[in-house]
Amino acid sequence: VVYLGDNLYDAGLPSEAYSRYSDIKAALDSQINLLKGTQAKGYMIPGNHDWENGRAGGYEAIMRQQAYVDQFGEGKIEFYPKEGCPGPVEVEIGDDVVLVMMDSQWWIHQNDKPGIESDCEYKTEDEVISELEDILNRNYNKLILLATHHPFKSNGPHGGYFTWKQHIFPFTEMRENLYIPLPIIGSAYPI
């Protein structure tokens, strides 16, 4: 089982002092408990919401989430990449299958995150790309499953692609039949 991020919506795992901590951690418990008592192995990668939706404090939030999963996952579920590092992390699933996990939020996070000064195995974008190329070349004859939160390429809104209807009639996103044409302003809405 691979959890592809946004494991705790809306802003990751808060400190235990936060008034809603118990409610928020219950969502994480449900994901962990799903695997207990089974033969399944689980992997959890962070998404932008686990990094406090890209805000300051995001690094601390994923460190709390990793510590929680490590403590209560009982070896059934692993949080990767570790320590807020970008990855890639390579896991052999079988003789012919390799799971490669990366933290895609690391690439776009504007606040504190591990970098050159960190203990991460790969500290820069170039090092991450080089290792990813090495993994792909080393496993060219296997099925490679690449697990990240954000898609590498998207033909949808996350990739910057919108339909003509979204550009001309942006209010139809809010109400199905609200066809008020806004040809210039409407193009700014999806952005």
Mark where each language-model region is.
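Active-site beta-strand/loop signature of hydrolases that rely on acidic residues for catalysis
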Residues: V1-G12, G47-H49, H149
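Short, glycine/acidic-enriched loop or turn micro-motifs at the edges of active sites
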Residues: Y9, W106, F152
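Extended active-site neighborhood of metal-dependent phosphoesterases/phosphodiesterases
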Residues: G12-Y140, I144, H158-I191
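Histidine-centered catalytic micro-motifs
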Residues: L146-K153
